[in-house]
Amino acid sequence: MNGVVIPQTPIAVDFWSLRRAGTARLFFLSHMHCDHTVGLSSTWARPLYCSPITAHLLHRRLQVSKQWIRALEIGESHVLLLDEIGQETMTVTLIDANHCPGSVMFLFEGYFGTILYTGDFRYTPSMLKEPALTLGKQIHTLYLDNTNCNPALVLPSRQEATQQIIQLIRQFPQHNIKIGLYSLGKESLLEQLALEFQTWVVLSPQRLELVQLLGLADVFTVEEEAGRIHAVDHMEICHSAMLQWNQTHPTIAIFPTSRKIRSPHPSIYSIPYSDHSSYSELRAFVAALRPCQVVPIVREQPCGEFFQDSLSPRLSMPLIPHSVQQYMSSSSRKTNVFWQLERRLKRPRTQGVVFESPEEKADQVKVDRDSKKHKKESLSPWAGCLSRLCPHPLQARKQLFPDFCRKEGDEPVLFCDSNKMATVLTAPLELSVQLQPVDEFPFPETREEIGLGSPLWSGGGSGSPTRGKQSNGMGCGSPPTHISRTTHLTPESGGLALKYLLTPVDFLQAGFSSRNFDQQVEKHQRVQCNNPAVMNTVDDV
C-alpha cells in the first residue's frame, strides 16, 4: 500500500486503514490505481477529498457513497479546518500529476509548514510553472514518487516511447494489435494511435465510459471487428491467448511499460512507456524545488541519498496547536469506537463445505466404542430397568449395586455373606435387591432422623406380600410384587444410601433433584407426624 499518515498533522493521503490511521482526520486520494486504494470500499464513511474525475470513478467503481466524497477543483486553493472550533485551518492545492486520469499532487500549507505530496506522477517542466509552486514557497517536506528512482534505469520520454510503438505497428500492417493496459491510464496513447493509423480502437464498455468522460476524440468503440487496435487487460496477454488469436488472424501484443517483462511468446513486445518519472526527471524536479527533506512514497526503495546535494537546510519541527491536538485526539478515540462498532456489526462469514478428516472420524468412532464398552461393564445387569424406573444418579447406582453378575440363565445373583446382608425392596417396587449392612455406611441415620415412611414389603414363604412385618428369610430369587404402601422400616435399615433408595413413589417425579431432597423429606415427615394413621395403613392390592 502506497499511502502515508503525515506526522504531526491530522492528514492522511492514500491511507485507508482506520485502525492504523491513528490521529488522521482528513483523508485525501491522489488517484484511482488499486495500490493507492487498498482498504477503501463502499463501507467508507468519512469525508474524502480528491479531484472531480477521481470522485466520479470512486463512486462508479468502488461504490463509495457520494455524501462522503469531496471533489476539489484542480489548480485552485481550498481552505479546510484543522480543529473543531475553526481556530486552525490549512490550504490545500491540487496540481495535475500527469500520471493517469484524475491523478493529482497535493500541496498542503498550514502550521506544519509546506508539504508537497506528489503521489504517482510523471514530471514535466510545465509543472514548475504552476502558480502554487512559482511564488517562491519553501517546500519543507517532499513526498516523492520514487518508482523509477534508479540511476541504472534510463527511460525515454512519453513522446519518444509513443514513436517507438508507432514504428513497431508499422512493421505489421496486416496484423491486429493488442495493447495490454491496466484498468486506468494510457488513454491518450490509444487516442494517438487511432489518429495515426486512422482506425477504431476497440475498448471494453467500462473504459469506453471513461474516455467519454475525459472528452477524448471519437475514435473508440466496443465492436470487436470495427478496428485492428484492441485495448485489453494486461493479464489477458499470455502464450495461450496469443495462439488463439493467431488462429483467427495474425496478431501481435504490446506492453507499454517500464517494467521488465519476460515475453512468453515471440509476438509479444515491451516498450518502455512509463507514467512514472525517470531518475533524471526526479533529479531535475527536486533540484528545482530544493525541499528541506525528501520522503519516498515507495518505502521499499529508499532514495534520500540521491538528493542530498539538492536539499535546503532542515527547519525545526513545528509545534502542534492545542486545538489541533484536541482535534486529533478526539479523532483517534472516534476511530477506535467506529472500528469496534463495525467489528460487532459485521456478519459472520458463511462457512463452506467442511469435510471430516477420516483419521479424526476413525478416532472418534474408537472413543465412542470404548466409552460404550466401559459403560456396559460398569453398570449392573439391571441398569436398564433402573434407569427407566428409578431416576437415581448413575454414581449412586454404582455404589448400591457393586457385585451383580449373571448366571447362565440370566438370573441376577449376588455373591455375598448372607449373615451380613439386609434384604430390602426399593420403590418403585419391581426389583428385589440386597444391600450391605447399614453399619458399613459412613453416615448412619435412623428412620426417625430422616423421617422416612418408605414403602417396604417382604415376601413370605409363598412369595405373597405380608402386611406390617419384615421377612427375615427372603432369598435373592423371590419375585417382587408391587404395592403402593408398606409398613415402617426398622431403625437398623437407615443409611445415607437409603435416602436415595428407600423413597416413596410420590417423590419419584420428573422434577426430582437431589439438591432439594432433604427439604422434601422434612416436609413429608411433618405431614406424616400430623397424621400418624397414614403411616400404618396399607392399601389393598
Curated annotation (Swiss-Prot):
It is found in: Chromosome, Telomere; Nucleus; Cytoplasm, Cytoskeleton, Microtubule organizing center, Centrosome. GO terms for molecular function: 5'-3' DNA exonuclease activity; 5'-3' exonuclease activity; beta-lactamase activity; damaged DNA binding; protein homodimerization activity; protein-containing complex binding. Residues 350-375, 450-489 are annotated as: Disordered. GO terms for cellular component: centrosome; chromosome, telomeric region; cytoplasm; nucleus. GO terms for biological process: double-strand break repair via nonhomologous end joining; interstrand cross-link repair; protection from non-homologous end joining at telomere; telomere capping; telomere maintenance; telomere maintenance via telomere lengthening; telomeric 3' overhang formation; telomeric loop formation. Residues 358-371 have a biased composition (Basic and acidic residues). There is a cross-link at K334 (Glycyl lysine isopeptide (Lys-Gly) (interchain with G-Cter in SUMO2)). CDD domains: SNM1A-1C-like_MBL-fold (cd16273). Ubiquitinated, leading to its degradation. Interaction with TERF2 protects it from ubiquitination. It catalyses: a beta-lactam + H2O = a substituted beta-amino acid. Keywords: Chromosome, Cytoplasm, Cytoskeleton, DNA damage, DNA repair, Exonuclease, Hydrolase, Isopeptide bond, Nuclease, Nucleus, Telomere, Ubl conjugation. SUPFAM superfamilies: Metallo-hydrolase/oxidoreductase. It comes from the Eukaryota. The keyword Nuclease applies. A motif (TBM) lies at residues 492-507. Gene3D superfamilies: 3.40.50.12650, Ribonuclease Z/Hydroxyacylglutathione hydrolase-like (3.60.15.10). It holds the Pfam family DRMBL. It is an enzyme of class 3 (hydrolase). Its EC number is 3.1.-.-, 3.5.2.6. 5'-3' exonuclease that plays a central role in telomere maintenance and protection during S-phase. Participates in the protection of telomeres against non-homologous end-joining (NHEJ)-mediated repair, thereby ensuring that telomeres do not fuse. Interacts with TERF2; the interaction is direct. Interacts with MUS81, MRE11 and FANCD2. Interacts with HSPA2, HSPA8 and HSPA14. Interacts with SPAG5. PANTHER family: 5' EXONUCLEASE APOLLO, DNA CROSS-LINK REPAIR PROTEIN PSO2/SNM1-RELATED. The TBM domain mediates interaction with TERF2. Belongs to the DNA repair metallo-beta-lactamase (DRMBL) family. This is 5' exonuclease Apollo. It comes from Rattus norvegicus. The gene is Dclre1b.
